[in-house]
């Protein structure tokens, strides 16, 4: 999880910005509860006795137009019948409100409905959930095929424009083998075909911290990372996330991969057609995600002050990347 940018922390005057947010969205300043400061400052606020989620970031990190790309896609999904945490417009009818910081930049505010239900727990971690996740992801991919940008300025990034994949910017320059492996894999992936049936705007960070489970129904939130990608990479990212930190620990990674993917794809194929041959590329996309997380960890950590545990974790990632180690030993041809 990314920490709020240190340059943003320096200029964030919480009380001022929250007062402005309350005025622009019409909620009570006294009923604002701090939740988190990861990629955004996140608060819960009340309006008409309904809870909403307020997210605050800064133009250092995102432009207002870039966020409009998220808001517009969310509305497209909601109109198509997918349960998402929808944006709430401000009293001025805006999806993104800008509060000047006095230094030429702005704090950007947006408010969302609070997703019904709860985070999944151990009792929910079973084939029903995996199947419903498949249906949910398949529905998003099916709907994204009909999405049209209303304004080219709102366009989200392509898969290879991801900041954390710029490994040379964050990883020590002597890790030549890491860069070679990343370049080689990304060049290979760039040759994959792209069409409306396999590539489009996707969530790109689905995991059990980003949706609520309400009596068998999923509502996703946190669409901060949406971008253009192959549908199979969106599936791979979710798989990487459930392998990385499962709600219920597994003994055998390959066996769990088989269990998860079997039920997930059953649900997925009910909602979206995707040529099964694409599943054979999942191991490559899992390795790509491993590289992205390696970049993210270097972006987060100060290598001069990290402890032994973090050093060991980075060393493990480096070994995996340099040796091209598969993330899971499962043979994906079993699903095809």
UniProtKB/Swiss-Prot annotation:
Which UniProt key words apply to this protein? Answer: Antibiotic resistance, Kinase, Transferase
Q: What's the superkingdom here?
A: Bacteria
Among its keywords, does the record have Cell cycle?
no
Q: Which reaction does it catalyse?
A: amicoumacin A + ATP = amicoumacin A 2-phosphate + ADP + H(+)
The record's listing under InterPro entries reads: Aminoglycoside_PTrfase, Kinase-like_dom_sf, Pseudomonas-type_ThrB
Q: What happens when the gene is disrupted?
A: Knockout mutant is susceptible to amicoumacin A.
Pfam families, A to Z: APH (PF01636)
Q: Name one GO molecular function term.
A: homoserine kinase activity
GO biological-process terms attached to the record:
response to antibiotic; threonine biosynthetic process
Enzyme Commission number, as recorded: 2.7.1.230
Classification via SUPFAM superfamilies: Protein kinase-like (PK-like)
- The protein's role, per its UniProt record: Phosphorylates the antibiotic amicoumacin A (Ami), leading to its inactivation. Mediates natural B.subtilis resistance to the drug.
What family is this?
A: Belongs to the pseudomonas-type ThrB family.
Instruction: Name it.
Output: Amicoumacin kinase
Question: To which species is this protein native?
Answer: Bacillus subtilis (strain 168)
